[in-house]
Regions:
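Alpha-helical substrate-recognition element adjacent to the catalytic core
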Residues: 1-14, 18-24
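Conserved acidic, metal-coordinating active-site core of Asp-based
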Residues: 29, 33, 40-153, 174
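Short, well-ordered alpha-helix to beta-strand connector turns
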Residues: 6, 86-87, 166, 183
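A short, compositionally biased
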Residues: 4-5, 37-40
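Hydrophobic residues in well-ordered beta-strands that form the structural core
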Residues: 3-4, 45, 171
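Mg2+-dependent phosphoryl-transfer enzymes with acidic/Ser/Thr/Gly-rich catalytic loops
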Residues: 124-203
Length: 203
């Protein structure tokens, strides 16, 4: 079982169990805000099966394909591309996305979508009321697992609800302060294989 795209999709390798989509007018408006007001930022949209962006030669596009292994496809214009199952809109900046979005983008859209930083480069926008925590709770009910039988790990703001939905939760030591405060415990940083160290104790 997999939780993907900030909790918007819960699936097996062959079947989608739960999916939440962004209203078209919301992600279209977000795209226009980025185009018109954030010239140093890029953006892409995600569906349950692939992502779409406008420039295959951009730094963002190459990172998503080369480092993350995304199935991301180039289209000439996101706003003119027929797609009805957008689950996430993401803004990209190479070093300060949250700061770039703070003056206009976030205040404009935070009442219409769940917006959270997922690293210095990314601001993820999900449907309202949808996050990794709602996905964890869906899985707990689906599998008959109690919160006390659940362990989660996180490092960024989009992980907080997930940490709060588990009986045992860890923030890696390099996580943001808000995430460390939300988790019940901490573990070593990701470059020290902190998550793996904890998982080995379960075996």
């Amino acid at each position: 079982l997999y939780i993907t795209d900030g909790g918007t999709v819960v699936r097996t390798p062959h079947k989608i169990l739960k999916v939440h989509t962004l209203p078209e007018d919301v992600w279209h408006g977000m795209c226009e805000t980025v185009r018109n007001n954030l010239p140093d930022c890029d953006c892409f949209i995600a569906t349950p099966d692939y992502c779409l962006a406008e420039d295959a030669g951009s730094r963002m596009f190459r990172w998503l394909t080369d480092s993350y292994g995304y199935d991301i496809r180039e289209v000439p214009d996101l706003l003119k591309t027929p797609v009805d199952n957008v689950i996430k809109f993401t803004v990209y900046h190479p070093s300060a996305c949250e700061e770039m979005c703070a003056p206009l983008f976030t205040p404009t859209w935070q009442t219409k979508a769940k917006i959270a930083s997922s690293g210095k480069e990314w601001m993820d926008c999900n449907p309202l009321g949808v996050n990794k925590g709602t996905a964890i709770r869906f899985l707990q009910e689906y599998l008959g697992i109690a919160p006390d039988e659940t362990c989660t790990f996180g490092d960024n703001l989009n992980d907080i609800e997930m940490l709060e939905s588990a009986g045992t939760s860890y923030a890696v030591s390099n996580a943001r302060e808000e995430v460390i405060a939300a988790a019940k415990r901490t573990c070593a940083a990701y470059w020290e294989n902190g998550v793996l160290q904890v998982l080995k104790t379960f075996l």
